[in-house]
Curated annotation (Swiss-Prot):
Any Gene Ontology biological process: photoperiodism
This protein's name: Protein ELF4-LIKE 2
Induction: Follows a light-dependent circadian-regulated expression with a peak at midday, about 6 hours after dawn.
UniProt gene name: EFL2
Subunit structure: Homodimer.
Length: 119
């Protein structure tokens, strides 16, 4: 019975937040970019640590450039995650605009639908 309930939850989620293939492709592309940069950062950090442990002047001098590259990569990852978050929020907002009466959109404004009282 739990499987059925889980399936109901997932199918409901899928219906509510359907994303088109292009949006999913963009998410996938961004996540691949992020992972590539994080892998590169791991290599940079390893090299920085080795240079630091060697205590050789030329290796320590090289660390300045490596740390700059690492910082730039971190900024790029933060930007990519920000773009992903923005895209996801837009897609959720777009899919929820036609939902039930009296709800609030993510911007805090009420939907324009009106309620009528009987009587």
């Amino acid at each position: 019975m739990e499987s059925r309930m889980e399936g109901d939850v997932y199918s409901g989620f899928g219906e509510r937040y359907q994303m088109d293939g292009k949006l999913l492709q963009n998410f996938q592309k961004s996540f691949v970019q992020v992972q590539d940069i994080l892998d590169q950062n791991r290599l940079l950090i390893n090299e920085i640590n080795q240079n630091h442990e060697s205590k050789q002047a030329d290796h320590l001098g090289r660390n300045v450039g490596l740390i700059r590259e690492l910082n730039n990569n971190i900024r790029t990852v933060a930007s990519l995650y920000g773009d992903l978050s923005h895209s996801f929020a837009r897609s959720v907002d777009a899919s929820s605009e036609g939902e039930s009466t009296g709800t609030l959109k993510s911007d805090g404004k009420a939907n324009n639908q009106k309620r009528f009282r009987s009587g």
